[in-house]
Amino acid sequence: MSTPEAPHAERTAGEPAPRARAKGEPRFPDGPKADPAGSHFERRIRSFQPRRSRVTAGQADALQRLWPVWGLDIDGSRRLDLAELFGNDRPVVLEIGFGMGEATAEMAAADAGTNILAVDVHTPGQGHLLHLAEERGLANVRVANGDAIILLREMLAPDALSGLRVFFPDPWPKKRHHKRRLIQPEFLTLAASRLAPGALLHCATDWEPYAEQMLEGLTAHPGFENTREDGGFAPRPEFRPLTRFERQGLDKGHVVNDLLFRRVPHDDRAGHRDGDPA
């Protein structure tokens, strides 16, 4: 199965500027949808807040040209065939929340034998990662738009993933917002059901109270085991590059904690049925 190639489009000199968008018209007709899942699934507390941000001309161009080839709207309507999505049967790592995509692109370039399915709702970041993938020839990156929970629950098969990365999720620091944090027992159970035995769950955060919550929750969960013999946090592995956001935090004296847990074999997870995350 061949890997799809991105189309290229060049504007000629003197080409007229795009017309103004009519009221109600999609922002990017061939790009990501504003709410791909719509109201087809139950309302629940979300760990993210979609926000409108300025999209540069380069990002808009990438969204229009490359989304039909390398983009995916999370609508929950079907079970994904990951080999078809990537054009090969290499291992797939899911990354939830990639910001502007620089670290994602760097990891994809360093490990061409692993496919990365990167999920975010931030339109400028989606466009920038698509641009980086084309610029650097990264055929192992696909960009997904929407709710990662719906993707995991409705669109991925049990044991489909060889890894899961959650780098610097929103810490929701106010106590009344802690319920919005992504790393919760219910999420970990869902994630465990979609990770193959031995797959790595890698989290990183610079918010220490959230790091402690992550460590406590992962340690208590029967689907995961800490790769650290001391049961604590891990040093940043060399394969995880420093992000722009992380550098800013380090400059302010923030402490960054990495957590690396492996998905334990099925037989070690008493009472769990594959495909039944809850």
Region roles according to the model:
Residues 96, 119:
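Conserved beta-strand/loop positions that form the S-adenosyl-L-methionine
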Residues 2-94, 102-109, 130-159:
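S-adenosyl-L-methionine
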Residues 99:
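Conserved glycine-rich SAM-binding loop
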Residues 197-205:
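Conserved beta-strand signature within the Rossmann-like core of class I S-adenosyl-L-methionine
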Residues 122:
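Conserved SAM/SAH-binding beta-strand->alpha-helix loop
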Residues 212-278:
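Class I S-adenosyl-L-methionine
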Residues 183-197:
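A short glycine-rich, Lys/Arg-flanked "PGG" loop and its adjoining helix->strand segment in the class I
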